[in-house]
Design a protein with these regions (language model features):
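Type III/flagellar secretion export determinants
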Residues: 1-129
Length: 129
């Protein structure tokens, strides 16, 4: 591991609703902006991680960032699933009707998540379009 800290920091911990919402809003904005693609050149995710890290005690920064990253992946997966459900032929990079994402809410995504070891996974998801 490049940090020299092993993987013990890869554990789930509580992350404030404020930062989960900031990450959700960013994922949604960038999902729309990039038509479902992830663009490492334009993303603002690092700013959210940095702000989060500065808001918590030093001993919680690594595990909190790990957890926030788990949420980020699940938010993106839910948006992908919603667009695919409405348009089965859609592929990332193609334009889509952004109103599809109006029904994807952070709370509804989080209500489907369960802990699986040190990861958050979807138990099930119901996307109404």
């Amino acid at each position: 591991d490049v940090t020299g800290k092993g993987t013990s920091w890869q554990q789930l911990t509580s992350v404030s609703e404020e930062y989960r919402q900031k990450m959700f809003d960013n994922v949604k904005k960038e999902f729309i902006q990039e038509n479902g693609l992830s663009n490492g050149d334009t993303t603002k995710r690092s700013d959210i991680f940095k702000d989060y890290q500065l808001s918590v005690n030093k001993d919680k920064r690594l595990s909190g960032t790990w957890t926030l990253e788990q949420y980020e992946g699940q938010y993106r997966a839910a948006m992908y699933a919603a667009v695919k459900s409405a348009n089965p032929n859609w592929k990332p990079g193609q334009k889509f009707d952004t109103s599809i994402l109006d029904n994807v809410k952070r709370e509804s995504v989080e209500s489907t998540l369960v802990k699986n070891g040190n990861r958050l996974v979807r138990n099930s998801i119901d996307v109404s379009v």
